Every structure is written in C-alpha cells, then in structure tokens.
Curated annotation (Swiss-Prot):
<dbReference type="InterPro" id="IPR036291">
    <property type="entry name" value="NAD(P)-bd_dom_sf"/>
</dbReference>
<comment type="function">
    <text>Catalyzes the NAD(+)-dependent oxidation of L-threonine to 2-amino-3-ketobutyrate. To a lesser extent, also catalyzes the oxidation of D-allo-threonine and L-threonine amide, but not that of D-threonine and L-allothreonine. Cannot utilize NADP(+) instead of NAD(+).</text>
</comment>
<feature type="site" description="Important for catalytic activity for the proton relay mechanism but does not participate directly in the coordination of zinc atom">
    <location>
        <position position="148"/>
    </location>
</feature>
<dbReference type="InterPro" id="IPR002328">
    <property type="entry name" value="ADH_Zn_CS"/>
</dbReference>
<feature type="binding site">
    <location>
        <position position="63"/>
    </location>
    <ligand>
        <name>Zn(2+) 1</name>
    </ligand>
</feature>
<dbReference type="GO" id="GO:0030145">
    <property type="term" value="F:manganese ion binding"/>
</dbReference>
<feature type="binding site">
    <location>
        <position position="107"/>
    </location>
    <ligand>
        <name>Zn(2+) 2</name>
    </ligand>
</feature>
<comment type="pathway">
    <text>Amino-acid degradation; L-threonine degradation via oxydo-reductase pathway; glycine from L-threonine: step 1/2.</text>
</comment>
<dbReference type="Pfam" id="PF08240">
    <property type="entry name" value="ADH_N"/>
</dbReference>
<dbReference type="GO" id="GO:0005829">
    <property type="term" value="C:cytosol"/>
</dbReference>
<feature type="binding site">
    <location>
        <position position="175"/>
    </location>
    <ligand>
        <name>NAD(+)</name>
    </ligand>
</feature>
<comment type="subunit">
    <text>Homotetramer.</text>
</comment>
<feature type="binding site">
    <location>
        <position position="64"/>
    </location>
    <ligand>
        <name>Zn(2+) 1</name>
    </ligand>
</feature>
<feature type="active site" description="Charge relay system">
    <location>
        <position position="43"/>
    </location>
</feature>
<dbReference type="GO" id="GO:0046870">
    <property type="term" value="F:cadmium ion binding"/>
</dbReference>
<comment type="similarity">
    <text>Belongs to the zinc-containing alcohol dehydrogenase family.</text>
</comment>
<dbReference type="InterPro" id="IPR050129">
    <property type="entry name" value="Zn_alcohol_dh"/>
</dbReference>
Length: 341
C-alpha cells in the first residue's frame, strides 16, 4: 500500500510502498479517507532533536485521520464494516494503576500512533478497536480528520469552568485557536488570544474570538483596559511553549486564576514563582485527550453549532503531500488536509 514514511535520519518524509498491516483479534482495519498534518509531523519532517531521540526509522507517520472500517478482529464488538471512524492516537497499556482506575489518558506506558508504531499516513491503518471512535453522520470528513488536535483543544479549554470568565489563550496555532473558539462557544465572557503571527491571528478573528492580539504591536494591558477588565484573567490556556508568553500570562492572571498548559516550554524556562505563590495560581499540565470523555464532548460541541471550518485552510491530494508540508512549515496555514481517495 501507499504510505508516507520517515525513511532516513534526515530532513524530509517520503512516499513509499509498505505491506498492509495485519489485523489482530482485538483490532480494526481502517481504510483511510483523509488525514491532517500535525505539528508533531512537522517536527518529524524537520528531524529535530526530539524526533531524533523518539522516532525509529523507518516509520509510517501520521495520527490525525478519518476512515472506514473494512476489517474487524474476531474478538471485537460494537463495530461493523462501513463504520466511519477516527481514533485516539495514544495506545495505552490497560494494566497500570491509572488505566485500571479509569484515567487512561494518564497511562505511563502510552505508545503513540505514527510515533512509536505505524501511523495513518497510509491507505490502511490498524488500531485497537478500543481506540476507535464512531463519527456521527452530521460531522464532515474534514472535521473528523482533525478530531485529534481538536481534542487537545477541548481537553485544555474545558479543564475549568469557563462560563462568564475572562480567558487568555497564549499561542494562535490551530490548537490554540480551536481552544479559544471552544471557550467562547461555552460561555466565556472575554476570550483574548495572543501571538506574533498575523496570519494565524486573522484566523482567530474569523472564529469569533473577542480579541486577537499581536503582542509585537499591542500591549496586552491596554487591551484588557479596552475590554473593561480590572482584575486580570480568570483562566489561562498556555498553548505556545514560549517563555515570554507564559510570563505575560502570569503577570495578567487574577488572584486565584487557573492555568492549563498544553504548550511545551524549554526545560530551562525560568519564571517568577512568587507570582504563582502570592496570586494563589493553579497550574495544570495537559497531555492528549481524556479517553473518551473528551471525544464525546468534541462531537457534541460541533453538533451544537461550533464552527471549526475556518481553521482548515489547505486541502491537497496525498500525491501532493509535499505542498501540504510546505504550507505547514511556512507558518502561513491553519490545518492542512490530505485526501487519500
């Protein structure tokens, strides 16, 4: 079958032929319809330090997808041939304390699809049936293909009660923009997103965010005054991994504020811890999605009117995958969809 693989320990991703994966007793075989390029895939393409330490070569990459069930393992219940599915990209062990306690998103033995085992940038994918999620009929293939990153956004945004709250989102990448849109959709008062990438800030404006702020040109305190905010942000969603952005968030949080962190800062990032302590801030780390509570919330948010369509900016045939990666690497894109049909 046709697949996109990391074939060499250098920059790039290559089209290749690989065997169709074998179906296990507890697995589904999925014929891929559409995939989306994740920032993780760009890291793998660039062959950065993280990728060099993490990705075995060769490896079929990709973990954002929608497809159709074409094979069912003999022990699988609850699925039928033709079901349209996406899937949780974190394969968990099932036997650690967190898995047995129902906190599977915190499994210490997690394996990543397209990272530690063959991924979805291929004509066919095999995953455990436990990881598959049926897509409702009224959700498009394009939106289903981005459920994985949308899940990161939903998990982060819904970590805290947002109704009537003032929310700061630092980092206007696709996940940050979707998190901001979720916050607005569920009843936050003011949702402010910050970045220095004007293209992506404009995408955020199309999603109905209260204010998209280019911090290279505007002062966040001035924006807060303009919005009538006198006490700081109640909730912070840190999506950038940029130390200056996180420090600004700490400066502008209200006392007792709550912060969810999805962005990955450098290991040597320094902050003024007195602001965390004396403001009584709560900081929560976010990894992946809650299985599968986040997935049900994702579907319900879209079905209740949340419009994510502006975040998808580019669509290509899989044969033009290089154009898709070029768009993602340029920083002048939202989500990029690759069609396998």
């Amino acid at each position: 079958m046709k697949a996109l693989s990391k074939l060499k320990a250098e920059e790039g991703i290559w089209m290749t032929d690989v065997p169709v994966p074998e179906l296990g007793h507890n697995d589904l075989l999925i014929k891929i319809r559409k995939t989306a390029i994740c920032g993780t895939d760009v890291h793998i393409y660039n062959w950065d330090e993280w990728s060099q330490k993490t990705i075995p070569v060769p490896m079929v990459v990709g973990h954002e997808y929608v497809g159709e069930v074409v094979g069912i393992g003999q022990e699988v219940k609850g699925f039928k041939i033709g079901d349209r599915v996406s899937g949780e990209g974190h394969i968990t062990c099932g036997h650690c304390r967190n898995c047995r306690g129902g906190r599977t998103h915190l499994c210490r033995n997690t394996i990543g699809v397209g990272v530690n085992r063959p991924g979805c940038f291929a004509e066919y994918l095999v995953i455990p049936a436990f990881n598959a999620f049926k897509i409702p009929d009224n959700i498009s293939d394009d939106l289903a293909a981005i459920f994985d990153p949308f899940g990161n956004a939903v998990h982060t945004a819904l970590s805290f009660d947002l109704v009537g709250e003032d929310v700061l989102v630092s980092g206007a990448g696709p996940i940050g923009i979707m998190a901001a849109a979720v916050a607005k959709h569920v009843g936050a008062r003011n949702v402010v997103i910050t970045d220095v990438n004007e293209y992506r800030l404009e995408l955020a404006r199309k999603m109905g965010i209260t204010r998209a702020v280019n911090v290279a040109k505007e002062n966040l305190n001035d924006v807060m005054a303009e919005l009538g905010m006198t006490e700081g942000f109640d909730v912070g969603l840190e999506m950038s991994g940029a130390p200056p952005a996180f420090r600004t968030m700490l400066d502008t949080m209200n006392h007792g504020g709550r912060i969810a962190m999805l962005g990955i800062p450098p290991s040597d990032m320094s902050i003024d811890w007195t602001k965390v302590i004396f403001k009584g801030l709560f900081i929560k780390g976010i990894y992946g999605r809650e299985m599968f509570e986040t997935w049900y919330k994702m579907a319900a948010l879209i079905q209740s009117g949340l419009d994510l369509s502006p975040i998808i900016t580019h669509r290509f045939s899989i044969d033009d995958f290089q154009k898709g990666f070029d768009a993602m690497r340029s920083g002048q894109s939202g989500k990029v969809i690759l069609s396998w049909d």
